[in-house]
Amino acid sequence: MKIFCLILFLISSFISTSLAVEPPPETIYQNFLQCFTNQTKAPPNSLADVVLPKTAAAFTPVLRAYIRNARFNTTATPKPAIVIAARSESHVQAAVICTKSLNIQLKTRSGGHDYEGVSYISHVPFFVLDMSNLRNITVDPATESAWVGAGATLGEVYYRIWEKTKSHGFPAGVCPTVGAGGHISGGGYGNMIRKYGLSVDYVTDAKIVDVNGQVLDRKGMGEDMFWAINGGGGASFGVILAFKIKLVPVPPTVTVFRVEKNLVENATEMVHKWQFVAPKTDPGLFMRLLLQPVTRNKMQTVRASVVALFLGDQNTVMSMLTKEFPELGLKKENCTEMTWIQSVMWWANNDNATQIKPEILLDRNPDMATFGKRKSDFVEKEITKDGLDFLFKKMIEVGKIGLVFNPYGGIMSTVATTKTPFPHRKKLYKIQHSMNWKDPGTEAETSFLQKAKSFYSYMAPFVTKNPRHTYINYRDLDIGVNTPGPNSYRVAEVFGRMYFGENFDRLVKVKTAVDPQNFFRDEQSIPTLPGKPARR
């Protein structure tokens, strides 16, 4: 009889467990709101524009406001149960504490430029912590420093610096709508990389909310965690609130230019020589190379464009490149002298940068989201002319593929690869693969994603190997995603070493120390050490 009762009990327990379901959305919302209210000591009616369930009128506008890739803005795209539109540090603390208590995944979004939508998409129940309201910027010209909120855009950062000082800038990206939190924590680079290095090279302090909901500065978090969030991707370790950055000097006059050639106009010669000049010339000169298949005179060809910033006057750069890079064919009419802040606008595709006001940089949403896919590579040895001819042929075959070559060298090659988690400093240049399309639907998406993979395979002989390095801020889920189970570390190690090289080991140790339960997790977050307990 006792055995029979035990069997009935076990069967009943099994059925109860099997039929257990996730609490309904309203229950999740009420539980979260109650916790959030308790943590912030705020009356519930004051949080109507902060804690947004799917039924809230502001839910969809806030969620969509910073979705920069149309691939992830469809009816089929997974949506969070709640969006937390934080307006204070206490809101961020409460978001971490309360989401953790409900055992729900938390995604943190600053600017929404993650190429794979990792900051606002998941395939398990999740909340989105939107940081766009935490964008305060305080610039102190006397100390040549600034505090930058994680939700600020790079355009806002540049504008606020210019507002206070005309002789300083900051080495970061050329797209003004990119969020500072994600950009800097992934390393951050722009057109002053050869002169000054990465954005993280100028971070002197930071504020982060850790897994326990505590606000920590550099001293509070310790040097290991500070090292990790400066290039290792902050979302694996906590929620970045702000970075303190050191400003860099910029001259009163800079020069920009653009030179374009196609294959008939000896673009191959120009591209080949670019590899020998761009990474080795004056550190104050950054020459980005853009490659794109186009049609000219009813013939398919490849257009090669050199787009440049020189921290000096046009006569100096003209004299320099006439000697070093005659294949470019730079002419005086290609060059425009302007101020540094005007060059920021010029690089943001404003050809009339000398006529428009810098306030345009405060526009957080000027660009329309298109469908896109990105990949990246690093090059250690110059590609031969035969190799370039092969790649040009494949670009024409694939169509719609764009390549962006960003030269390194300069100060980059003088910095140890372990100074920050970013390990790629000694490379000649970085390549961004860009695939954009306008056609909605799964058929078009499948086709273009396959084309992106195909071209990535064509590039393999010419780039780094074992591992094939790639850039964390050019997120690519094709190279691997985290999976639960006993092999989770080994799976993460594959893409982790592609992003971070040998620095991956130190990142894992830091992660295990500061977030042993793996609360801050996503598709490509840093894993904990094998054998350590982790959330699933």
Swiss-Prot record:
Modifications after synthesis and translation: The FAD cofactor is bound via a bicovalent 6-S-cysteinyl, 8alpha-N1-histidyl FAD linkage.
InterPro entries the record matches: BBE, FAD-bd_PCMH, FAD-bd_PCMH-like_sf, FAD-bd_PCMH_sub1, FAD-bd_PCMH_sub2, Oxid_FAD_bind_N
Disulfide bonds: 35-98
SUPFAM superfamilies with a match to the protein in the record: FAD-binding/transporter-associated domain-like
Glycosylation (residues): 38, 73, 136, 266, 334, 352
Keywords: Cell wall, Disulfide bond, FAD, Flavoprotein, Glycoprotein, Nucleotide-binding, Oxidoreductase, Secreted, Signal
Enzyme Commission number, as recorded: 1.1.1.-
Cellular compartment(s): Secreted, Cell wall
UniProt keyword annotation of Acetylation present: no
Covalent link 6-(S-cysteinyl)-8alpha-(pros-histidyl)-FAD (His-Cys), residues: 113-175
Gene Ontology CC terms, in alphabetical order: extracellular region; plant-type cell wall
CC cofactor: FAD
Domain FAD-binding PCMH-type: start-end pairs: 76-250
Molecular function terms from GO: FAD binding; oxidoreductase activity, acting on the CH-OH group of donors, oxygen as acceptor
A Pfam short name: BBE
Keyword flag Nucleotide-binding: yes
Gene3D superfamilies registered for this protein in UniProt: 3.30.465.10, 3.40.462.20, Uridine Diphospho-n-acetylenolpyruvylglucosamine Reductase, domain 2 (3.30.43.10)
Cofactor comment text: Binds 1 FAD per subunit in a bicovalent manner.
Secretion signal span: 1-20
Enzyme class: oxidoreductase
Family per record: Belongs to the oxygen-dependent FAD-linked oxidoreductase family.
Protein name: Berberine bridge enzyme-like 2
